[in-house]
């Protein structure tokens, strides 16, 4: 399975876990690709930080009003953008690649406004991180 497909599987697992109010292991069995499970697990581990960033940069939209699938996409994108070191493998995706993957996932599975919304938030986080460096 390609990394893009593994990212999308992690997004869907997080989305289903939220909707069904079940542990991650139920929508995503442990025998899936290691990257997929690790990505979803790390998103949950870092969720308070990721959600704080989403709240900060989505000034006109409270976190609770953002569609659950879009929240999952944002969380995965933010994790890969900010914490690539927590994921398995030596081929971390560059920041711009993480944003592109999130936007492409939104184009495929969300409404018309979602890709630009996701791009705006992830781009703002990246610009803020660059200016802090």
Predicted regions and their residues:
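N-terminal interaction/assembly modules
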Residues: 1-115, 119-133
């Amino acid at each position: 399975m390609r990394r893009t497909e593994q990212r999308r599987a992690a997004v869907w697992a997080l989305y289903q876990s939220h909707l069904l109010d079940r542990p991650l292991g139920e929508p995503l069995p442990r025998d899936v690709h290691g990257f997929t499970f690790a990505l979803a697990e790390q998103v949950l581990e870092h969720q308070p930080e990721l959600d704080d960033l989403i709240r900060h940069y989505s000034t006109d939209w409270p976190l609770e009003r953002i569609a659950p699938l879009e929240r999952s996409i944002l969380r995965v994108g933010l994790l890969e953008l900010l914490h690539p070191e927590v994921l398995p493998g030596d081929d971390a995706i560059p920041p711009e690649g993480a944003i592109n993957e999130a936007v492409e996932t939104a184009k495929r599975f969300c409404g018309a406004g979602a890709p630009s919304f996701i791009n705006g938030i992830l781009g703002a986080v990246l610009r803020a991180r660059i200016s802090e460096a």
